[in-house]
């Protein structure tokens, strides 16, 4: 996916010193590469019975909503704590320094749902793993996790060893 890589910009020392941020705004700003990314994210799952796409806040919303639209299924936002207005199911997880929570509406998924989780980037896998657990806590099944970017050196795929993982660009 070299074509996608040309539209991912490196921003050194953002959001803090020592971090090399992968900026996807050139990719999503270009219709051809955005379309390519969406089609490559969903392609392995066209023959699966996906009933919903879960997008992980925040950039997973960009790709997840487009993948859901292409598949003709609903989009489920997995949000940071306190961002959803209705009754929620919440899951807490550990970050490198501290903890965080993800939430989904309690009526968004249930038994029989087969969910494709989508995000822009797989790093350590903590947020993705929590997303899988949140989906499963609602009674649904995780079909797979799909990412535009995977930072291989952070070994996030290992935390997702119970799931199918599909990534387009590797660093």
Curated annotation (Swiss-Prot):
Keyword Glycosyltransferase: yes
Compartments, as annotated in UniProt: Cytoplasm
Keyword Transmembrane helix recorded: no
Keywords, ordered alphabetically: Cytoplasm, Glycosyltransferase, Purine salvage, Transferase
Pathway this chain belongs to: Purine metabolism; AMP biosynthesis via salvage pathway; AMP from adenine: step 1/1
Subunit details: Homodimer.
Functional note: Catalyzes a salvage reaction resulting in the formation of AMP, that is energically less costly than de novo synthesis.
Protein name: Adenine phosphoribosyltransferase
Provenance organism: Nitrosococcus oceani (strain ATCC 19707 / BCRC 17464 / JCM 30415 / NCIMB 11848 / C-107)
């Amino acid at each position: 996916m070299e074509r996608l890589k040309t539209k991912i910009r490196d921003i050194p020392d953002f959001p803090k010193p020592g971090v090399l941020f992968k900026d996807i705004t050139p990719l999503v700003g270009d219709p051809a590469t955005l379309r390519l990314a969406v089609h490559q994210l969903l392609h392995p799952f066209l023959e699966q019975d996906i009933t919903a796409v879960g997008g992980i806040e925040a950039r997973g919303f960009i790709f997840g909503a487009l993948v859901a639209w292409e598949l003709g299924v609903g989009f489920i936002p997995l949000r940071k704590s306190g961002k959803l207005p209705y009754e929620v199911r919440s899951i807490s997880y550990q970050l490198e320094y501290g903890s965080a929570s993800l939430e989904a509406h309690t009526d968004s998924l249930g038994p029989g749902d087969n969910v494709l989780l989508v995000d822009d980037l797989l790093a350590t896998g903590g947020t993705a793993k929590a997303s899988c657990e949140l989906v499963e806590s609602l009674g649904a099944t995780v079909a797979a996790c799909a990412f535009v970017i995977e930072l291989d050196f952070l070994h996030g795929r290992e935390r997702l060893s119970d799931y199918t993982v599909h990534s387009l660009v590797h660093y």
